[in-house]
């Protein structure tokens, strides 16, 4: 499966280290640490760079196995989630990639798995090629807190992407508590945008403030009439009380202004949501933006009641590092 036929890539990468995901157990990491698999950036090749263990590689690499068995790494997800698809990425590993890999999962209410933990198969063993993406859809609605990557028998993996939806038990949410309903860790998801030439739309919902311009959403320079936009599905329906539009790191390329439309969408097809969004109500009228600054809007918001989706419009183009939508979840 190639990238064009892997629609699950639009989901959040639950293995992203920026979410707090980390490797908690590993059988071997002689040549390169398993933590590199979880880095958000794309893997790179450094010609002629060696360290004390050998050739420097941007990923996880184990030593050559001289006995029975296989290598594995256990990842604790920063937020529990339901997987929609995975990418086992072996870019730059040629001659030292594993010929096969599989994934297991478990749900630990507390702590990390131990010898008594029961694991379930998430992805049966699949063949791997060197220097390649390996996309596989996952059809399983069970949430996981930990994933175990098995490689057979040894070798190197550049990146492990675990695309899915964060799992949250909203029934345990204290009444009246305001949350960032757009946050990726709360299930918020960027669905569509007019352009993401320089920075992916999903970055808007990442935790914390952006580390650089690349950690935000940025469009190409608009040379035709119109403006850019992005549509976000909230993690849970709710009434918005405050909106934050952050242009941190965007200085000569920030939007002149922005507005937000919103709606309570019931059913329908996500593929049609772009056209539907043209007629959504105005949550935030057009507001002027400044460079490299966090803009918080409260009194400017219109009281629309519970909503499920928003459309952030930026005029005419540019970059925004974060979008925050604080509100009270509409609980049963």
Swiss-Prot record:
- What does the record give as its pathway? Nitrogen metabolism; (S)-allantoin degradation; (S)-ureidoglycolate from allantoate (aminidohydrolase route): step 1/1
Cysteine pairs forming cystine bridges in this chain are none
Report the domain of life of the source organism: Bacteria
Q: Which UniProt keywords apply?
A: Hydrolase, Purine metabolism
**Positions in coiled-coil regions:** none
Name the SUPFAM superfamilies on file.
Answer: Galactose-binding domain-like (SSF49785)
Pfam families from the xrefs?
Answer: Allantoicase (PF03561)
- Tell me what reaction this enzyme catalyses: allantoate + H2O = (S)-ureidoglycolate + urea
Gene Ontology molecular function: any one: allantoicase activity
The protein's Enzyme Commission number: 3.5.3.4
Q: What class of enzyme is it?
A: hydrolase
One GO BP on record is: allantoin catabolic process
Q: What does the similarity note say? A: Belongs to the allantoicase family.
Protein name, per record: Probable allantoicase
Q: Which organism is it from?
A: Pseudomonas aeruginosa (strain LESB58)
Q: In the record, what lineage is assigned to the organism producing the protein?
A: Bacteria, Pseudomonadati, Pseudomonadota, Gammaproteobacteria, Pseudomonadales
Its gene is alc
